[in-house]
Each structure stands twice: as C-alpha cells, then as structure tokens.
Amino acid sequence: RANLLYTLGRNHKVSITSFFTAENIKGHDQRGVATYKKDPLANPQALTRNYLGIGLESRFLEEKLTNILSLKHFYSRAEVADISVDQIMKGQKLSHFTKPGFGNAIRYEILPVLSVSANYEYTVRLPDSEEIFGNFISIISNAEIRPETSHNINVGTRYKSSAASHFPITAEINGFYRQTSDRIFLGVLNQSKSAYMNLLSTTTKGLEAEVNYSPLKTLTVFVNGAWQDTRLRKTDEGGKISSRYIGARVPNMPWLYANMGLNYILPAHIVKTDRISFFYTFNYVHDFLLSWEVDGVRSSKATIPQQLIHSAGIGYRFPGEKLTLSAECRNISNERAYDNYLVQKPGRSAFLKLRLFLGD
C-alpha cells in the first residue's frame, strides 16, 4: 500500500493511493482428485489485484464547502482451475479485468456543528480469493466470475457538538441508493457444492443512522442501525434466475439490523499511569428469508431467525502505553446465531488478546 499527499496552495490538495495484493496457491488437493479425477492444484493458482486512486480535495466559501473529485482504476488477473457447474474440470484458465471508477463528493457546513453532504460514485468490487478459488471443500472455483459494478448515490446530514460542550454528541443519518450489475452471489449447485456466480442485477435503497454520546468524560455510548431493501432489477444472461422474480427482494440478505454499546474508562484519580476499561455491545439482526419471498407461503419458508447477541469485556493498558491485554466474552447468553444460508455460528465464546505496540 502506498499513499501520497501533495498540497496545492491553501485550498486544494491532491492524494494518490495504490493498493496491491498478490496470492498464490500451491499444493496437492486429494479431495479434488477424488471429485474431479484431476488435481485442481496440479498447476499453481494465482490472483493479483491492484487499485489506484487519485483525488482532488478543494475548499471554497471560507472552507464551508468541500468538494472531493476522485478517479479510480481497478485491475485483476487470475489463474484458476476451470471447473464447470456440473463439476467437470476443464483445465486452467486465465482471466483479467481492467475497469475504471470515478466519483464526486460534496459537503457544506451550514453551521459550525451541522453539515450536509451528497456524493455519487461509479465503483467496482473485484472478486476476492474465496469467490474465485472457492474453499476447496464445499465451494468450488469459478474461473469466469466478473467484478461487480455499481452506481452509488448517498445523501446525509451530520451534527457534532462543539469542542467546548460538556456532553459531546455526534449524530449522523444517511440515505443511499445503489444500482449494481454482475452482483456476486453464492449459488447452490447441489446438496454438497456451491459456487460464487454473477447472478443478479439489483437496486438497493436504504437508510443508516448513528449516534455517539459521552455523558461523562470516561463514558461513551453509541447506537447505530440500518435498513436496506435490495430488489432484483433484471435477470442474468444465463437464465439461472427466472424473470418472475424481477421486483422481488433478494433472499438470504439481512435487511434490518442495529448495534449499541458503551465503553467506560476508570477515572485517572483511580488509576494513575495505566488504564482499565470496560465495554459492552449488543447486536440485533431481524429475521430474513433464505429463499425468494414470492415463492409459496411465508410460514413454510426457511428463515434465518431474529438474533440478539450480548458481548462484554475488559481491557488493561500497561504503563508506557505499548502493551495492552483484553478479555472478551461474546454471546454471553449463548443465543443461537446464524450466518447467511442458515449456517450456525459459535455460541458463547471467550477471547484473550495481547497487543504490543512497537516504535514510538
């Protein structure tokens, strides 16, 4: 990763960002030999991705108006085992994509504590390694998967209390609209195998909000939540999704969720040179359907149930601020938690983490 920032006078600055990743997979896949009669790893598989972005930030009207113009370039190159949907290995395939992106964001400060913003971007999401290579167990590779592209529009407003406030509060609400093509979707091939595919073109509209509040210097409370409605816009070229689903909500996607939590730090007169903190989080996910809502009776459908998860922990920062130790218990009440496709997550679990900061 590389970042470069150059200032052009008082009100303008240019930023350049580059992010490069490379992955290589070598070895022997004995399970693959049994399934496909050939070893998917007989030839090394590789994925190279690069993102390059250039941004121009400008300030006008005594710095009340900020505009950020951005240009982006996305590149991907993959060498992957070519396995058909009927699980026949056809050899090795090379794919590469080069796609542009661009956007503009504008923010206006109405008052020192209140601002409004809007932005548009045309962006690309390159497939990651699992979406291309699979996991070599239940998800097979897809050598023909394409990047997602989307037109995104966001509008919002933000309030942040003044620095002199005794009870700092920040509140933000945003609305968004997204039109996505070549949406990457995990499709089921049979009872034991799945593959990531470009199945859907969709539209998504939604709202998200967040509030952070500090009633005490040592206590911070936050609440956030989001609602989103993702609908099928048109069917894929392969005909894997029937046109009768156009306009229906895309299944297997959470559409309403929220989080809240707090963080409390023991006051300085209790702990002098070190720091002890306590934290608590609550996560809520509304129930959502595993299959298309227009098929059959809702009461007979597989549903990912509502989830209510409580977690808490304690952190200790040693004197010198370079060593921290934290302990956390997730899902304290041992509720049933699920991922997409009704895959159950771990129940109550405990974690201990030690972090050492090197350098100044």
In which residue ranges do the predicted regions lie?
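Face-selective signature of the C-terminal outer-membrane beta-barrel domain
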Residues: 1-93, 97-112, 119-121, 163-177, ...
